[in-house]
């Protein structure tokens, strides 16, 4: 079992766009200001191990908890009236992950190893933006459809490999690997001003699901102590899909 706690405070330089009110966003200039930091990061590792005559296994949990005590930072514009503008800070987020790994020896020459993992990552920090500047060229034409992203991503992984030392000089292997990154965040339409300050744009966030399969059949033959021949067949397949797309 392992637990870590880290507190970070101070300031870090960060660059972002700023423009004088009531000008349009086409009058933007780059500002570099010290952004206050007040972070708390905690990680947890817990594992249980088992070892038998022919097999071994490990079940583990990993948790990561990041919290930013600030949500937004307000600063005075570089020109024009004394108007404050808003810059969001890093969003707080949480990750939970379960892992299972192990292996088994069928015989002295044939062995199998594999692993499974399941992770859940979430982020639900409130948005920070200057909706009050519209319609004078502010970033948002209308208020955001949601107060926060309410983002969540589920990741799944599985792998399995079988090896066989067929002869002294010949080794055969077969392996499979599967990865699935499923973004469950809802898709919403966000309306904001384009960079020219005259046109508006409507863009949805696009939560994608990406699945990847990998397979390999291979043989290694040792010619002598310094040379060997490897023959392998690999198959990679990637699927991308979007279950929801705001219109």
PLM region descriptions:
Residues 36-40, 90-94, 150-154, 207-211, ...:
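Short sequence motifs at beta-strands and strand-loop junctions characteristic
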Residues 11-20, 25, 29-34, 70-78, ...:
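Outer-membrane beta-barrel translocator domains and adjoining extracellular loop/strand segments
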Residues 1, 9, 54-59, 108-114, ...:
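Repeated loop/turn-to-beta-strand initiation elements of outer-membrane beta-barrel proteins
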Residues 51-54, 94, 104-108, 164-170, ...:
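Outer-membrane beta-barrel strand-turn architecture
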Residues 1-56, 61-64, 74:
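Post-signal-peptide, soluble extracytosolic/periplasmic N-terminal scaffold domains
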Residues 3-9, 52-56, 63-67, 118-122, ...:
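Transmembrane beta-strands of outer-membrane beta-barrel pores
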Residues 1, 46-50, 100-104, 160-164, ...:
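Residues on the lipid-exposed face of transmembrane beta-strands in outer-membrane beta-barrel proteins
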